[in-house]
């Protein structure tokens, strides 16, 4: 068994202890001061982002959230990655209970914090980290805590993420395949970074203990099995499944089989790092006239098939900080000047595929401008959009089956959405 945590500390931004829980008796509260000293020493180091530090026989693993440090100290040869993952789950649980994890919420709810730390870790080993399950027997009401005498079924059940006895009048499953496109284009029009981060997000409202089976399109399945495919295979990376997925079954026949938690959760996340063609391309031509007037010609072109349509398109165009009196014309949509952003915001509700639209704008500048004025740093063009019924990767859900011993019929709903993530073009 991997080494255990000796203690867990919650520290403020200055390194002062807010709460700490000793699990094994082999460290003291002084460990917090030694950790923070190491943290300060690391600030000037090129590896300062390393979440693990070692000092005098003690390993420190930490994460920072808002103005709080969560730190585990251990004297054993522990699995640092596992304990760091546990700290992130602690953050999720605290946010579930207190909405915001920050110094004030910990001080106001320190009794609940101690109770949660006792349930989430036992003798230094992680235990229950599902917020829904913990909330069944650790309840808060105006900073009061109630502890039920009998633990919920989910704690003693093999399926710890789902309680027994769940009932719904209408049994439904909603599955959203959401992909975020990240693109960075430099001033020469070259793509310097592109990837797609995807997630299969589920919301389940099902009675009992249902068994779900999900099948993806052949290009994903066959690629995973190393067999030949028709057309281009989908090369997904960094695939992560929710703990409910039977990994042994997936390794055997690539079937995603699981008993789902109740409510919303991420069934699977993945990344696609192959070169992605920009779905919306923006070109900008800027002309300055005797330093008193600037004209902009912007062309926005959709580079996806005509059968798809982008919605809620928003193109943020940087303008000089001292610009004023804008005059704007667009061939589609509307544009408004946002002086607080030093930008012109072009909004298009519906942008069909394989189309191009233009925006012309004219701004006035102060009539007197210093000849030696330092050129200001150019902000990038930022683009936001959503494309329903479309995925960049081509991933598709072939089937979603719900089987429950009572034999009820459940309605599965599947939709696809591609969205802009960090989508920037440094063309201006």
From Swiss-Prot:
<dbReference type="GO" id="GO:0035653">
    <property type="term" value="P:clathrin-coated vesicle cargo loading, AP-1-mediated"/>
</dbReference>
<dbReference type="Pfam" id="PF01217">
    <property type="entry name" value="Clat_adaptor_s"/>
</dbReference>
<dbReference type="InterPro" id="IPR036168">
    <property type="entry name" value="AP2_Mu_C_sf"/>
</dbReference>
<keyword id="KW-0813">Transport</keyword>
<comment type="subunit">
    <text>Adaptor protein complex 1 (AP-1) is a heterotetramer composed of two large adaptins (gamma-type subunit and beta-type subunit), a medium adaptin (mu-type subunit) and a small adaptin (sigma-type subunit).</text>
</comment>
<dbReference type="GO" id="GO:0007034">
    <property type="term" value="P:vacuolar transport"/>
</dbReference>
<keyword id="KW-0967">Endosome</keyword>
<comment type="similarity">
    <text>Belongs to the adaptor complexes medium subunit family.</text>
</comment>
<keyword id="KW-0472">Membrane</keyword>
<dbReference type="GO" id="GO:0006892">
    <property type="term" value="P:post-Golgi vesicle-mediated transport"/>
</dbReference>
<keyword id="KW-0333">Golgi apparatus</keyword>
<dbReference type="InterPro" id="IPR011012">
    <property type="entry name" value="Longin-like_dom_sf"/>
</dbReference>
<dbReference type="GO" id="GO:0030121">
    <property type="term" value="C:AP-1 adaptor complex"/>
</dbReference>
<dbReference type="InterPro" id="IPR001392">
    <property type="entry name" value="Clathrin_mu"/>
</dbReference>
<dbReference type="InterPro" id="IPR018240">
    <property type="entry name" value="Clathrin_mu_CS"/>
</dbReference>
<protein>
    <recommendedName>
        <fullName>AP-1 complex subunit mu-2</fullName>
    </recommendedName>
</protein>
<dbReference type="InterPro" id="IPR022775">
    <property type="entry name" value="AP_mu_sigma_su"/>
</dbReference>
<keyword id="KW-0653">Protein transport</keyword>
<dbReference type="GO" id="GO:0012510">
    <property type="term" value="C:trans-Golgi network transport vesicle membrane"/>
</dbReference>
<dbReference type="InterPro" id="IPR028565">
    <property type="entry name" value="MHD"/>
</dbReference>
<dbReference type="Pfam" id="PF00928">
    <property type="entry name" value="Adap_comp_sub"/>
</dbReference>
<dbReference type="GO" id="GO:0031901">
    <property type="term" value="C:early endosome membrane"/>
</dbReference>
<dbReference type="InterPro" id="IPR050431">
    <property type="entry name" value="Adaptor_comp_med_subunit"/>
</dbReference>
<dbReference type="GO" id="GO:0005634">
    <property type="term" value="C:nucleus"/>
</dbReference>
<feature type="domain" description="MHD">
    <location>
        <begin position="170"/>
        <end position="426"/>
    </location>
</feature>
<keyword id="KW-0968">Cytoplasmic vesicle</keyword>
<dbReference type="GO" id="GO:0006886">
    <property type="term" value="P:intracellular protein transport"/>
</dbReference>
<dbReference type="GO" id="GO:0005802">
    <property type="term" value="C:trans-Golgi network"/>
</dbReference>
<comment type="function">
    <text>Subunit of clathrin-associated adaptor protein complex 1 that plays a role in protein sorting at the trans-Golgi network and early endosomes (TGN/EE). The AP complexes mediate the recruitment of clathrin to membranes and the recognition of sorting signals within the cytosolic tails of transmembrane cargo molecules. Required for KNOLLE localization at the cell plate to mediate cytokinesis. Functions redundantly with AP1M1 in multiple post-Golgi trafficking pathways leading from the TGN to the vacuole, the plasma membrane, and the cell-division plane.</text>
</comment>
């Amino acid at each position: 068994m991997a080494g255990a945590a000796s203690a867990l500390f919650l520290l403020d931004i200055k390194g002062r202890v807010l709460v700490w829980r000793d699990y094994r008796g082999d460290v003291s509260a002084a460990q917090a001061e030694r950790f923070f000293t190491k943290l300060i020493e690391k600030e000037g180091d090129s590896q300062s982002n390393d979440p693990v530090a070692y000092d005098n026989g003690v390993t420190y693993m930490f994460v920072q959230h808002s103005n709080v440090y969560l730190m585990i100290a251990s004297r054993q040869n522990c699995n640092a990655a596992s304990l760091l993952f546990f700290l992130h789950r602690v953050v999720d649980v605290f946010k579930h209970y207190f909405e915001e994890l920050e110094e004030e919420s910990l001080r106001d709810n320190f009794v609940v914090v101690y109770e949660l730390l006792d349930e989430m870790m036992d003798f230094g080993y992680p235990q229950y980290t599902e917020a829904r399950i913990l909330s069944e027997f650790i309840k808060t009401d105006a900073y009061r805590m109630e502890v039920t005498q009998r633990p919920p079924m989910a704690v003693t059940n093999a399926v710890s993420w789902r309680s027994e006895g769940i009932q719904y009048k209408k049994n439904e499953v909603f599955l959203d395949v959401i992909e975020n496109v990240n693109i960075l284009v430099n001033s020469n029009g070259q793509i310097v970074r592109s990837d797609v981060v995807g997630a299969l997000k589920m919301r389940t409202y099902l009675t009992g203990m249902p068994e779900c089976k999900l099948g993806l399109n052949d290009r994903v399945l066959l690629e995973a099995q190393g067999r030949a495919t028709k057309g281009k295979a989908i090369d997904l990376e960094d695939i992560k499944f929710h703990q409910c997925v039977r990994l042994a079954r997936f390794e055997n026949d690539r079937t995603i089989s699981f008993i789902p938690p109740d409510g919303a959760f991420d069934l699977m996340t993945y990344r696609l790092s192959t070169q992605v063609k920009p779905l919306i391309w923006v070109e900008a031509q800027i002309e300055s006239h005797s330093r008193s007037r600037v004209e902009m010609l912007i062309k926005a072109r959709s580079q996806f098939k005509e059968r798809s349509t982008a919605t809620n398109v928003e193109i943020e165009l940087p303008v000089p900080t001292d610009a004023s009196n804008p005059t704007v014309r667009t061939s589609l949509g509307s544009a408004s000047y946002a002086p607080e952003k030093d930008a012109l915001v072009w909004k298009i509700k519906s942008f069909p595929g394989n189309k191009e639209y233009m925006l012309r704008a004219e701004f006035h500048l102060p009539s007197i401008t210093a000849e030696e004025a330092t050129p200001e740093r150019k902000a990038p063009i930022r683009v936001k959009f959503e494309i329903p019924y479309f995925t960049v990767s081509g991933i598709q859900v072939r089937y979603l089956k719900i089987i429950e011993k009572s034999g009820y019929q459940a309605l599965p709903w599947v939709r696809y959405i591609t969205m802009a993530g960090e989508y920037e073009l440094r063309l201006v």
